[in-house]
Protein backbone atom coordinates (compact mmCIF):
# COMPACT_ATOMS: atom_id res chain seq x y z
CA UNK A 1 0.00 0.00 0.00
CA UNK A 2 1.19 3.53 -0.77
CA UNK A 3 1.14 5.72 2.35
CA UNK A 4 1.85 9.44 2.61
CA UNK A 5 2.82 10.81 6.02
CA UNK A 6 2.55 14.53 6.65
CA UNK A 7 5.13 15.64 9.21
CA UNK A 8 8.69 14.51 9.98
CA UNK A 9 8.80 14.97 13.73
CA UNK A 10 9.56 11.99 15.93
CA UNK A 11 5.98 10.70 15.63
CA UNK A 12 5.86 11.03 11.84
CA UNK A 13 9.27 9.43 11.33
CA UNK A 14 8.45 6.57 13.70
CA UNK A 15 5.23 5.99 11.76
CA UNK A 16 7.21 5.89 8.52
CA UNK A 17 9.74 3.41 9.89
CA UNK A 18 7.17 0.93 11.18
CA UNK A 19 5.01 1.22 8.05
CA UNK A 20 8.06 0.54 5.86
CA UNK A 21 8.95 -2.45 7.99
CA UNK A 22 5.43 -3.74 7.42
CA UNK A 23 6.05 -3.61 3.67
CA UNK A 24 4.32 -0.38 2.67
CA UNK A 25 5.58 2.17 0.16
CA UNK A 26 5.99 5.30 2.29
CA UNK A 27 6.57 8.97 1.48
CA UNK A 28 7.09 11.59 4.21
CA UNK A 29 6.44 15.25 3.39
CA UNK A 30 7.55 18.19 5.52
CA UNK A 31 7.94 21.94 5.03
CA UNK A 32 11.20 21.98 7.01
CA UNK A 33 14.68 21.22 5.67
CA UNK A 34 15.04 17.99 7.68
CA UNK A 35 13.49 15.82 10.38
CA UNK A 36 12.71 16.93 13.94
CA UNK A 37 13.25 20.64 13.39
CA UNK A 38 10.16 21.85 15.27
CA UNK A 39 8.59 20.32 18.40
CA UNK A 40 10.97 17.33 18.43
CA UNK A 41 14.09 19.47 18.22
CA UNK A 42 15.00 20.25 21.84
CA UNK A 43 12.51 18.67 24.21
CA UNK A 44 13.32 17.59 27.76
CA UNK A 45 14.79 14.26 26.63
CA UNK A 46 12.74 12.00 28.88
CA UNK A 47 11.26 8.66 27.88
CA UNK A 48 9.06 8.35 30.92
CA UNK A 49 6.05 6.02 30.70
CA UNK A 50 5.53 6.04 34.46
CA UNK A 51 5.21 9.81 34.53
CA UNK A 52 2.76 9.81 31.64
CA UNK A 53 -0.05 11.86 33.15
CA UNK A 54 -2.51 14.47 31.91
CA UNK A 55 -2.08 18.11 32.80
CA UNK A 56 -5.82 18.02 33.50
CA UNK A 57 -5.75 16.80 37.09
CA UNK A 58 -7.64 17.36 40.35
CA UNK A 59 -6.55 20.61 41.93
CA UNK A 60 -5.09 22.10 38.76
CA UNK A 61 -7.79 24.81 38.36
CA UNK A 62 -7.00 26.22 41.81
CA UNK A 63 -3.27 25.87 41.23
CA UNK A 64 -3.62 27.74 37.94
CA UNK A 65 -5.12 30.71 39.76
CA UNK A 66 -2.25 30.69 42.26
CA UNK A 67 0.35 30.34 39.53
CA UNK A 68 -0.91 33.53 37.90
CA UNK A 69 0.82 35.48 40.68
CA UNK A 70 4.09 33.48 40.82
CA UNK A 71 7.28 34.49 39.06
CA UNK A 72 8.39 30.95 38.23
CA UNK A 73 4.93 29.45 37.61
CA UNK A 74 4.87 26.26 35.50
CA UNK A 75 1.66 27.31 33.73
CA UNK A 76 0.66 30.58 32.07
CA UNK A 77 -2.47 31.48 30.12
CA UNK A 78 -2.93 34.33 27.68
CA UNK A 79 -6.08 34.56 25.58
CA UNK A 80 -5.34 34.30 21.86
CA UNK A 81 -8.69 35.67 20.72
CA UNK A 82 -10.06 32.40 19.38
CA UNK A 83 -13.20 30.56 20.38
CA UNK A 84 -11.29 27.30 19.99
CA UNK A 85 -8.92 28.18 22.84
CA UNK A 86 -11.85 28.80 25.20
CA UNK A 87 -13.56 25.56 24.15
CA UNK A 88 -10.35 23.63 24.65
CA UNK A 89 -9.81 25.05 28.15
CA UNK A 90 -13.40 24.24 29.14
CA UNK A 91 -12.93 20.68 27.95
CA UNK A 92 -9.67 20.45 29.87
CA UNK A 93 -11.37 21.66 33.05
CA UNK A 94 -13.98 18.93 32.66
CA UNK A 95 -11.17 16.39 32.69
CA UNK A 96 -9.81 17.65 36.03
CA UNK A 97 -11.92 15.27 38.13
CA UNK A 98 -10.35 12.34 39.96
CA UNK A 99 -12.39 9.90 37.87
CA UNK A 100 -11.35 11.36 34.52
CA UNK A 101 -7.74 11.73 35.66
CA UNK A 102 -7.54 8.02 36.49
CA UNK A 103 -9.03 6.99 33.13
CA UNK A 104 -6.83 9.34 31.13
CA UNK A 105 -3.64 8.47 32.99
CA UNK A 106 -4.37 4.78 32.53
CA UNK A 107 -4.65 5.25 28.76
CA UNK A 108 -1.46 7.27 28.62
CA UNK A 109 0.57 4.83 30.71
CA UNK A 110 -0.69 1.93 28.57
CA UNK A 111 0.53 3.52 25.34
CA UNK A 112 3.72 4.86 26.90
CA UNK A 113 4.73 1.49 28.38
CA UNK A 114 4.08 -0.19 25.05
CA UNK A 115 6.08 2.51 23.30
CA UNK A 116 9.10 1.97 25.53
CA UNK A 117 8.94 -1.76 24.75
CA UNK A 118 8.89 -0.90 21.04
CA UNK A 119 11.87 1.43 21.48
CA UNK A 120 13.85 -1.22 23.30
CA UNK A 121 13.12 -3.75 20.54
CA UNK A 122 14.10 -1.18 17.91
CA UNK A 123 17.36 -0.51 19.71
CA UNK A 124 18.11 -4.22 19.94
CA UNK A 125 17.32 -4.73 16.25
CA UNK A 126 19.20 -1.75 14.83
CA UNK A 127 21.73 -0.61 17.42
CA UNK A 128 20.51 2.98 17.01
CA UNK A 129 22.41 5.46 19.21
CA UNK A 130 21.04 8.78 20.46
CA UNK A 131 22.93 9.62 23.68
CA UNK A 132 20.47 7.39 25.47
CA UNK A 133 20.64 6.36 29.11
CA UNK A 134 18.65 3.75 31.01
CA UNK A 135 19.14 5.10 34.53
CA UNK A 136 15.48 5.75 35.27
CA UNK A 137 13.72 9.00 36.14
CA UNK A 138 13.39 10.70 39.50
CA UNK A 139 10.55 13.02 40.51
CA UNK A 140 11.65 15.43 43.24
CA UNK A 141 9.32 16.78 45.92
CA UNK A 142 10.11 19.97 47.79
CA UNK A 143 7.10 19.85 50.15
CA UNK A 144 5.32 17.23 52.23
CA UNK A 145 2.10 18.06 50.40
CA UNK A 146 3.70 17.08 47.10
CA UNK A 147 5.00 13.85 48.59
CA UNK A 148 1.57 12.99 50.00
CA UNK A 149 -0.05 13.87 46.69
CA UNK A 150 2.03 11.26 44.89
CA UNK A 151 -0.21 8.56 46.37
CA UNK A 152 -2.73 8.78 43.52
CA UNK A 153 0.03 8.38 40.94
CA UNK A 154 1.51 5.46 42.84
CA UNK A 155 -1.90 3.76 42.80
CA UNK A 156 -1.99 3.98 38.99
CA UNK A 157 1.59 2.71 38.77
CA UNK A 158 0.70 -0.27 40.94
CA UNK A 159 -2.36 -1.05 38.84
CA UNK A 160 -0.22 -0.94 35.68
CA UNK A 161 2.56 -3.01 37.32
CA UNK A 162 5.11 -0.23 36.79
CA UNK A 163 8.14 -0.62 39.11
CA UNK A 164 8.77 2.35 41.40
CA UNK A 165 10.76 3.38 44.47
CA UNK A 166 9.68 6.00 47.01
CA UNK A 167 12.89 7.60 48.29
CA UNK A 168 13.66 9.61 51.42
CA UNK A 169 15.88 12.72 51.18
CA UNK A 170 18.84 10.63 52.36
CA UNK A 171 18.18 8.01 49.67
CA UNK A 172 17.99 10.51 46.82
CA UNK A 173 21.76 10.79 46.59
CA UNK A 174 22.03 7.07 45.83
CA UNK A 175 20.11 7.65 42.61
CA UNK A 176 21.58 11.09 41.90
CA UNK A 177 24.83 11.66 43.86
CA UNK A 178 24.97 15.36 42.97
CA UNK A 179 21.77 15.96 44.98
CA UNK A 180 23.66 15.28 48.23
CA UNK A 181 24.48 18.98 48.57
CA UNK A 182 20.83 20.05 48.30
CA UNK A 183 18.99 17.16 49.97
CA UNK A 184 17.90 19.50 52.79
CA UNK A 185 15.66 21.29 50.27
CA UNK A 186 13.80 18.10 49.39
CA UNK A 187 11.21 15.96 51.17
CA UNK A 188 11.63 12.88 49.00
CA UNK A 189 11.37 11.48 45.52
CA UNK A 190 9.58 8.96 43.34
CA UNK A 191 11.97 6.96 41.17
CA UNK A 192 10.94 4.90 38.17
CA UNK A 193 13.91 2.66 37.33
CA UNK A 194 12.44 1.50 34.02
CA UNK A 195 12.38 4.94 32.40
CA UNK A 196 15.01 6.21 29.97
CA UNK A 197 16.43 9.38 28.43
CA UNK A 198 17.89 10.46 25.12
CA UNK A 199 18.25 13.18 22.52
CA UNK A 200 14.98 13.13 20.59
CA UNK A 201 16.28 15.13 17.63
CA UNK A 202 19.31 12.86 17.24
CA UNK A 203 17.09 9.78 17.52
CA UNK A 204 14.66 11.09 14.91
CA UNK A 205 17.44 11.96 12.46
CA UNK A 206 18.99 8.52 12.76
CA UNK A 207 15.63 6.76 12.59
CA UNK A 208 14.87 8.69 9.40
CA UNK A 209 18.11 7.33 7.94
CA UNK A 210 17.05 3.80 8.91
CA UNK A 211 13.66 4.41 7.32
CA UNK A 212 15.35 5.60 4.12
CA UNK A 213 17.33 2.36 4.03
CA UNK A 214 13.96 0.57 4.01
CA UNK A 215 12.80 2.59 1.02
CA UNK A 216 11.02 5.52 2.65
CA UNK A 217 11.17 8.71 0.58
CA UNK A 218 11.52 12.01 2.43
CA UNK A 219 10.44 15.18 0.70
CA UNK A 220 11.69 18.16 2.69
CA UNK A 221 11.24 21.87 1.95
CA UNK A 222 7.85 20.98 0.50
CA UNK A 223 4.71 23.01 1.19
CA UNK A 224 1.71 21.08 2.50
CA UNK A 225 -1.28 23.12 1.42
CA UNK A 226 -4.41 20.98 1.62
CA UNK A 227 -5.99 17.56 1.29
CA UNK A 228 -7.80 16.91 -1.97
CA UNK A 229 -11.13 15.15 -1.41
CA UNK A 230 -13.15 13.09 -3.88
CA UNK A 231 -15.95 10.60 -3.28
CA UNK A 232 -15.76 11.00 0.48
CA UNK A 233 -12.10 9.96 0.59
CA UNK A 234 -8.73 11.65 0.42
CA UNK A 235 -7.62 11.80 -3.20
CA UNK A 236 -4.24 13.43 -2.63
CA UNK A 237 -2.17 16.08 -0.88
CA UNK A 238 -1.84 19.44 -2.56
CA UNK A 239 1.81 20.51 -2.36
CA UNK A 240 2.18 23.73 -4.28
CA UNK A 241 1.39 22.95 -7.92
CA UNK A 242 1.66 19.20 -7.36
CA UNK A 243 -0.81 16.66 -6.01
CA UNK A 244 0.82 13.72 -4.22
CA UNK A 245 -1.39 10.63 -4.30
CA UNK A 246 -1.45 7.49 -2.17
CA UNK A 247 -3.80 4.82 -0.82
CA UNK A 248 -3.66 6.03 2.78
CA UNK A 249 -2.73 9.33 4.41
CA UNK A 250 -1.36 10.03 7.89
CA UNK A 251 -1.54 13.47 9.47
CA UNK A 252 1.28 13.84 12.00
CA UNK A 253 1.56 17.61 11.96
CA UNK A 254 1.53 18.17 15.71
CA UNK A 255 -0.27 21.35 16.74
CA UNK A 256 -0.89 22.24 13.10
CA UNK A 257 -3.03 19.13 12.56
CA UNK A 258 -6.17 20.85 13.86
CA UNK A 259 -6.33 23.61 11.26
CA UNK A 260 -5.10 21.36 8.47
CA UNK A 261 -8.07 18.97 8.68
CA UNK A 262 -10.65 21.47 9.96
CA UNK A 263 -12.72 21.16 6.79
CA UNK A 264 -13.11 17.43 7.48
CA UNK A 265 -13.46 17.23 11.26
CA UNK A 266 -12.81 19.23 14.38
CA UNK A 267 -10.15 17.78 16.67
CA UNK A 268 -9.23 19.35 20.04
CA UNK A 269 -5.45 19.56 19.59
CA UNK A 270 -4.09 22.87 20.88
CA UNK A 271 -0.46 24.13 21.03
CA UNK A 272 1.03 23.99 24.52
CA UNK A 273 4.16 26.13 24.45
CA UNK A 274 7.24 24.86 26.25
CA UNK A 275 10.83 25.99 26.67
CA UNK A 276 14.26 24.44 27.10
CA UNK A 277 17.88 25.38 27.54
CA UNK A 278 20.84 23.15 26.69
CA UNK A 279 24.03 23.84 28.64
CA UNK A 280 27.51 22.34 28.32
CA UNK A 281 28.63 20.27 31.32
CA UNK A 282 31.53 21.82 33.23
CA UNK A 283 31.66 19.42 36.20
CA UNK A 284 30.39 15.90 35.55
CA UNK A 285 30.30 15.09 39.28
CA UNK A 286 27.93 18.01 39.88
CA UNK A 287 25.65 17.12 36.97
CA UNK A 288 22.76 14.66 37.00
CA UNK A 289 23.44 11.02 36.16
CA UNK A 290 20.10 10.51 34.43
CA UNK A 291 17.10 12.84 34.71
CA UNK A 292 15.03 14.48 37.42
CA UNK A 293 11.66 16.19 37.38
CA UNK A 294 11.21 19.11 39.76
CA UNK A 295 7.57 18.78 40.84
CA UNK A 296 7.36 22.38 42.05
CA UNK A 297 8.28 23.98 38.75
CA UNK A 298 7.34 21.08 36.43
CA UNK A 299 10.84 21.21 34.94
CA UNK A 300 12.90 18.24 33.78
CA UNK A 301 16.69 18.23 33.99
CA UNK A 302 18.29 15.59 31.77
CA UNK A 303 21.87 14.43 31.26
CA UNK A 304 23.14 13.88 27.72
CA UNK A 305 26.77 12.92 27.03
CA UNK A 306 28.36 16.35 27.42
CA UNK A 307 25.25 18.50 27.85
CA UNK A 308 22.42 19.15 30.27
CA UNK A 309 18.94 19.71 28.85
CA UNK A 310 16.52 21.66 31.07
CA UNK A 311 12.95 21.80 29.80
CA UNK A 312 9.36 22.22 30.77
CA UNK A 313 6.61 24.70 31.62
CA UNK A 314 3.40 25.25 29.71
CA UNK A 315 1.91 28.33 28.16
CA UNK A 316 -1.57 28.34 26.65
CA UNK A 317 -0.94 31.24 24.28
CA UNK A 318 -1.73 29.96 20.80
CA UNK A 319 1.01 29.74 18.18
CA UNK A 320 3.23 32.42 19.70
CA UNK A 321 6.86 31.18 19.58
CA UNK A 322 8.45 34.23 21.18
CA UNK A 323 11.45 33.37 23.38
CA UNK A 324 10.73 35.03 26.73
CA UNK A 325 13.70 35.92 28.91
CA UNK A 326 11.71 35.29 32.11
CA UNK A 327 11.26 31.66 31.10
CA UNK A 328 14.98 31.22 30.54
CA UNK A 329 15.55 32.70 33.98
CA UNK A 330 13.25 30.07 35.50
CA UNK A 331 15.04 27.21 33.74
CA UNK A 332 18.44 28.50 34.82
CA UNK A 333 17.24 29.01 38.39
CA UNK A 334 15.95 25.45 38.63
CA UNK A 335 19.04 23.67 37.32
CA UNK A 336 21.43 25.89 39.27
CA UNK A 337 19.42 25.32 42.45
CA UNK A 338 19.49 21.52 42.20
CA UNK A 339 22.81 20.96 40.39
CA UNK A 340 24.96 24.02 41.13
CA UNK A 341 28.13 24.05 39.07
CA UNK A 342 27.09 21.14 36.89
CA UNK A 343 26.56 23.10 33.70
CA UNK A 344 27.41 26.53 32.35
CA UNK A 345 24.01 28.14 31.85
CA UNK A 346 25.62 31.34 30.56
CA UNK A 347 26.54 29.36 27.43
CA UNK A 348 23.21 27.58 27.10
CA UNK A 349 21.13 27.65 23.94
CA UNK A 350 17.49 28.71 24.41
CA UNK A 351 14.57 27.12 22.53
CA UNK A 352 10.79 26.98 22.46
CA UNK A 353 8.38 24.53 20.87
CA UNK A 354 4.66 23.91 20.58
CA UNK A 355 3.45 20.59 21.98
CA UNK A 356 0.18 19.31 20.47
CA UNK A 357 -2.09 18.80 23.48
CA UNK A 358 -5.54 17.27 23.83
CA UNK A 359 -7.86 18.24 26.72
CA UNK A 360 -7.59 14.75 28.24
CA UNK A 361 -3.85 14.39 27.63
CA UNK A 362 -4.22 11.23 25.56
CA UNK A 363 -3.01 11.45 21.95
CA UNK A 364 -5.19 10.82 18.92
CA UNK A 365 -3.87 7.76 17.12
CA UNK A 366 -5.72 5.72 14.54
CA UNK A 367 -8.57 5.77 12.06
CA UNK A 368 -10.92 8.65 11.35
CA UNK A 369 -14.43 8.83 9.85
CA UNK A 370 -12.66 9.31 6.49
CA UNK A 371 -11.73 5.76 5.50
CA UNK A 372 -8.22 6.41 4.18
CA UNK A 373 -7.22 9.17 6.60
CA UNK A 374 -5.33 8.37 9.80
CA UNK A 375 -4.18 10.62 12.64
CA UNK A 376 -1.08 10.41 14.82
CA UNK A 377 -1.05 13.63 16.81
CA UNK A 378 -1.90 15.20 20.16
CA UNK A 379 0.91 13.63 22.20
CA UNK A 380 1.49 16.80 24.24
CA UNK A 381 4.68 16.67 26.27
CA UNK A 382 5.08 12.93 25.61
CA UNK A 383 5.74 12.69 21.89
CA UNK A 384 9.23 11.27 22.47
CA UNK A 385 7.92 8.84 25.08
CA UNK A 386 5.02 7.60 22.95
CA UNK A 387 6.51 7.83 19.45
CA UNK A 388 7.57 4.25 18.76
CA UNK A 389 4.42 2.73 20.21
CA UNK A 390 2.23 5.16 18.30
CA UNK A 391 4.10 4.40 15.08
CA UNK A 392 3.82 0.64 15.53
CA UNK A 393 0.15 0.92 16.51
CA UNK A 394 -0.63 2.98 13.43
CA UNK A 395 1.28 0.59 11.17
CA UNK A 396 -0.76 -2.32 12.54
CA UNK A 397 -4.05 -0.50 11.95
CA UNK A 398 -3.16 0.49 8.38
CA UNK A 399 -1.94 -3.06 7.71
CA UNK A 400 -5.20 -4.53 8.98
CA UNK A 401 -3.51 -6.24 11.93
CA UNK A 402 -4.82 -6.37 15.48
CA UNK A 403 -2.70 -4.00 17.63
CA UNK A 404 -0.78 -5.40 20.58
CA UNK A 405 -2.61 -3.06 22.98
CA UNK A 406 -6.15 -1.74 23.32
CA UNK A 407 -6.47 1.06 20.79
CA UNK A 408 -10.15 1.94 20.41
CA UNK A 409 -10.03 4.63 23.12
CA UNK A 410 -6.99 6.30 21.52
CA UNK A 411 -8.68 7.25 18.25
CA UNK A 412 -10.41 10.51 17.34
CA UNK A 413 -13.80 8.86 17.77
CA UNK A 414 -13.79 9.56 21.50
CA UNK A 415 -14.05 13.25 20.60
CA UNK A 416 -16.52 13.11 17.73
CA UNK A 417 -20.29 13.11 17.66
CA UNK A 418 -22.19 12.22 14.54
CA UNK A 419 -24.15 15.05 13.02
CA UNK A 420 -25.95 15.18 9.66
CA UNK A 421 -23.18 15.09 7.07
CA UNK A 422 -20.42 16.09 9.44
CA UNK A 423 -18.51 15.41 12.61
CA UNK A 424 -17.92 17.88 15.39
CA UNK A 425 -16.04 18.01 18.70
CA UNK A 426 -17.72 16.55 21.75
CA UNK A 427 -17.40 19.71 23.83
CA UNK A 428 -20.93 19.53 25.20
Swiss-Prot record:
The keyword Flavoprotein applies. Its EC number is 1.4.99.-. It is an enzyme of class 1 (oxidoreductase). Keywords: FAD, Flavoprotein, Oxidoreductase. Pfam families: DAO (PF01266). GO terms for molecular function: D-amino-acid dehydrogenase activity. SUPFAM superfamilies: FAD-linked reductases, C-terminal domain, FAD/NAD(P)-binding domain. Pathway: Amino-acid degradation; D-alanine degradation; NH(3) and pyruvate from D-alanine: step 1/1. NCBIfam families: PRK00711.1. This is D-amino acid dehydrogenase. It comes from Burkholderia orbicola (strain MC0-3). The lineage of its organism: Bacteria, Pseudomonadati, Pseudomonadota, Betaproteobacteria, Burkholderiales.
Amino acid sequence: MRVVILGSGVVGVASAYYLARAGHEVTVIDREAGPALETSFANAGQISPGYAAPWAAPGVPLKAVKWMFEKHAPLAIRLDGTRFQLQWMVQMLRNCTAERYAVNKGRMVRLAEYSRDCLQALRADTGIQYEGRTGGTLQLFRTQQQLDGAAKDIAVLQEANVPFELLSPAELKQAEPALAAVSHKLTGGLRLPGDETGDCQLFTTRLAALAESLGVKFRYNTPIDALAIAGGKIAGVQCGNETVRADAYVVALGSYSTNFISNLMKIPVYPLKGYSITAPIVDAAAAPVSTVLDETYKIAITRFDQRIRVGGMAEIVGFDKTLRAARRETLEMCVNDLFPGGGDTSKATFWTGLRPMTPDGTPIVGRTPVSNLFLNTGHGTLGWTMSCGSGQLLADLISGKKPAIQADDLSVHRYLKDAPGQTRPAYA
